[in-house]
């Protein structure tokens, strides 16, 4: 059920001398009344891939709409962030044999981010980011080991923001960032599978929130989606997962319950506040159902450990559905 915001009035709709309402009719914060929190996350993605010889060209477009609330003494305000990203990538296979594969990639993406409080715009910026990466996979102790080393640089192109006259504590558009991702997949039995993923991010610049490494919630450390996440210019995130395939049918699909534990830690540059650093850990108990054109994922999330300034709920439920098309 979505929180009721029908009582809110835009400034231009108020009569001369009229005060904007702080809540619905009958709302009294002095009696302990609390207005509902609003949290919405909508993701839209499109990706097209074209392969020719040892090259792969990928075009991508995505849109993220994230709404959350924050409280003042007697009312609640809603904040919305909208991000539109267009990307192009070209990958070249350098080495491929029966056991290993090595790929070099270059890419360019343009990000347009806008933030609002109610209907008032807070920020409107464009970042253009170039990146290069080296990606490899190989067999290792009966499993498959993968690693990716990447470098990103903010560029003065396509209408991007520039850093001229910015202070040392101001977020940088012309930043440098390094990333390292590793993953390991190993079947322990015919049905039992172990997965391990780790991500490291390092930058000496103060990054915008869209470029910081974010940890917590869906697709990350479980149990922290509704209470915000932690972000950092430097970060490490680790995930361990065990899954058991109870159904493996070409006709009916694949069904796998799973259990995972994740940990994340961040640090921010030029920041002396309580949010300078943070950590969290959480567990997921879930069920995946994969078919030819549809993937479903339902999970129970439980926060375990955290920094003191984080106030997670006791539990959360996640659900996702993905439609797949090939043409």
Model-assigned labels for residue ranges:
Residues 2-7, 36-37, 64-73, 97, ...:
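Sequence/structural signature of outer-membrane beta-barrel proteins
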Residues 52-59, 66-67, 96-102, 140-145, ...:
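Repeated loop/turn-to-beta-strand initiation elements of outer-membrane beta-barrel proteins
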Residues 116-254, 263, 267-269, 309-311, ...:
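C-terminal outer-membrane beta-barrel translocator/porin domains of Gram-negative envelope proteins
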Residues 1-5, 9, 30-33, 59-63, ...:
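Transmembrane beta-barrel strands of outer-membrane/channel proteins
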